Amino acid sequence: MKGEISISVRRLVEFVLRHGDIDNRHHAGADNAMQEGSRIHRMIQKRMGPEYQAEVALKMTFEEEKYFLTLEGRADGIIQMEDRVVIDEIKGTYRDPVKWKEPMPLHLAQAKCYAYIYGTQQNLSEVQVRMTYCHIPTETLRYFYLDYTMPELTAWFQGLMAAYRKWADFTWDWREIRQNSIKGLSFPFPYRDGQKELVANVYRTIYHKKKLFMEAPTGVGKTISTIYPAVQAMGQGMGEKLFYLTAKTITRTVADDTLEILREKGLHFKSVILTAKEKICFMEETECNPEYCPYAKGHYDRINDALYDLLMTEDSFSREKIEEYAAKHQVCPFEMCLDMSLFADAVICDYNYLFDPHVYLKRFFGDSVGGEYLFLIDEAHNLLERGREMYSAVLVKEDFLALRLELKKTIVSDTSGNARKSEVSGQMTLDMTGESADASILIDQTSTVFYPAENTINALSEVRHKGRRGGRSILVREGYADKMVYHLEKCNQEMLAMKRECEGCCLVEDIDSFVQPLMRLRAVMDDYLAEQEDGQLPVRDLLLDFYFEIGHFLEMYELMDENYVKYTQLGDDNSFRLKLFCVNPAANLRQCMGRGRSSILFSATFLPIQYYKKLLGGTPEDYEVYAKSVFDAEKRALFIADDVTSKYSRRSDEEYANIAAYIEEIVKNRHGNYMVFCPSYAFLYRIYAQYAERYGGEGRECLIQGESMGEVDREEFLSRFRGNDMLDLQADIAMEIEEEDSILIGFCVLGGIFSEGIDLKNDSLIGAIIVGTGLPQVCFEREILKNFFDEEGENGFDYSYRYPGMNKVLQAAGRVIRTTEDVGIIALLDERFLQGSYQRMFPREWESFEEVSLGTVAKRVERFWNEWL
């Protein structure tokens, strides 16, 4: 029996018929138009009469030599009239469609596909297509009517399918190769203790279409233990594509290496790593338009050949391979990278590509549509704060003033006789008589058209309406700079009113009076950005940045529910900001994960797991599992100090001196590399000063984490630790005596770049000394979180402070033991760790610890090292 592959109408026409340049100057409002699409569709469909069928599912299957190809989609509307059938395609746009001479080609192609499918299935002789465009700011409608005979549609459609056939053939042939290779694939290593159960849990979760929250300590092999069962599930038809989502670049590399191991064992599996545009762009600036970038010019004319070339020759689409083939075919490497995801079996990428409301992969998740996707979410403890960040929004009053000032300069320059850079003229004569495929045009003027009275603020703004409808004609001419200045001032006045009511930080309830002028401001910006093709305004870059900020703010405003808090804040420099703070992102994250079949969320520090399950979108029906550590607990000493703390009430020179003494007592018994993690930079500097003064000198080398370390500085810092790892055994023995007193100590910030995501194996790091409990600094947002979860019936202090702090502690402690051969010390220098409220958060492997004091710690450390040296 033949198998089946399917493709949506939209994806088919967008892939096969695309051509020309990449030009981001034309599409600044495209994302917002897509987000408004559902509302626009519902609004228009409700206006139609009883003969209007909305959201009609259409599907047609074609038999090919090896497979059945199914094309499916949903017509926005089908109108059954006495003398004809009309296929209605609705599109929302921020550009003014009154000025268009014809519909957008890809939009029309989509409607023609629906017309062909419906006409064929209903044995029609001809079909009329109506393209309905809605100008989102004014809700004015414009119609294009086009008539087609079925022979015309058939000839056009057959050409479209012929162009896609080689891609369909590749998809089918590769799927057969992939599935057959999975059948013979076995786990590439001997199973570690508990690892087989871990693999089974992942597979079982995918089978039942659930989410799994998994605490997977370092060493259990979490990457292979999640990827392997996911691949096996795909082999059984439970998943069409795997997404491996991470927070860090290094983790993406590990995932790619794991797939390469499976490929070496016989797996045929194509994978792509999505790289940020700023990193992969060939040009100095990411100006995606044909005038600046040669790779943008004609990109769509060449991209499909580039894709096919790479598909036929490689299975791993790394950044290097993407850059190689993009340069060869002179196409944009970033867009090529995104397109390769269509054909990859695994997509390795940042969280953003699934969860961020602006960056998510619309080709897979657009219009709230998902698929049989498997989401493997690594280091998922990071997703909570990332989620809050992605679904929060902030606007700063001073940004409104800055843009207003720059725009006023362009208006002033207009009065000097220069060309009016801030003004665009356009005219359109509307022909109401024809009804042929040359596109008859109608404008629905029943909708309210709103134009603010800008003439009250600037005589430079000219608004003249001229048109032809029953003898009348319309000409629209508007000065965009002065319109934006007007709305910027309105927004600024509303923020000024809020500022006067604010003392430091304060919660606000109603911001509708601010949002209304903000929406009008964005509408004017949309019109301007849609009209401008070569960036006439000198402040276009500043305007674009601000445009995206207010767009995000308005989108989050629409999402706001009981999981949001609105507040204003007055800065020390008198700056003022308004924030929509997403306190609990669970619903948003759950919705995103709902776009796939199953999600596996895992981390080495996922405790307490119910806390993460609740806030990361889990439900009572979802699963959680705690993987057993494979490391020998005897090779790791855990000490807890009972006589020091980082509490604010105890901070003093005496306490800093005691902590410095603890560090010395711990490191003096064994030469090697240590890291000391402090709760803040200020605390770090005090501890370092005490240690350097009392114990610094010969045999002690101290490094300090800088407050703004770049990638080069970071690697140089880590290279000092990795030096020991490069010594072979003979050299290590030879240097044992002469380096007996050599000690390297890195003073780092808890929760910073060196406390998570670094892999220091063997003797690269033999001790982590953690000062304090990692509690976040008390601030207005943390107090908002505390109060919110208190009202939810949870322990607000735990949710806001204790749990996030403990995660930082666990991450820092996890830097020490990285392999089964590693031996090392973890010292928790805060007496609060002896309290039950903290010990309840300890992982199972921390059940055995030693309570120490400044007077006893040296002997305990010495005894531990004597057992292993």
For the regions a protein language model found, what residue spans apply to each?
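Metal-dependent nuclease catalytic cores that hydrolyze phosphodiester bonds in DNA/RNA
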Residues: 1-83
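Mg2+/Mn2+-dependent nuclease catalytic core
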Residues: 60-154
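Conserved pre-motif I regulatory segment
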Residues: 173-215
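A substrate-engagement module of RecA-like helicase motors
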Residues: 179, 238-347, 352-355, 412-419, ...
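Walker A/P-loop
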Residues: 207-229
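Signature of the SF2 helicase/ATPase Hel1-core->accessory helical subdomain module
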Residues: 226, 253, 329-346, 351-415, ...
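A contiguous, basic/glycine-rich beta-loop/short-helix subdomain that forms a polymer-engagement track
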Residues: 322-347, 357-365, 521, 527-645, ...
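Conserved RecA-like P-loop NTPase helicase motor core
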Residues: 643-654, 708-834
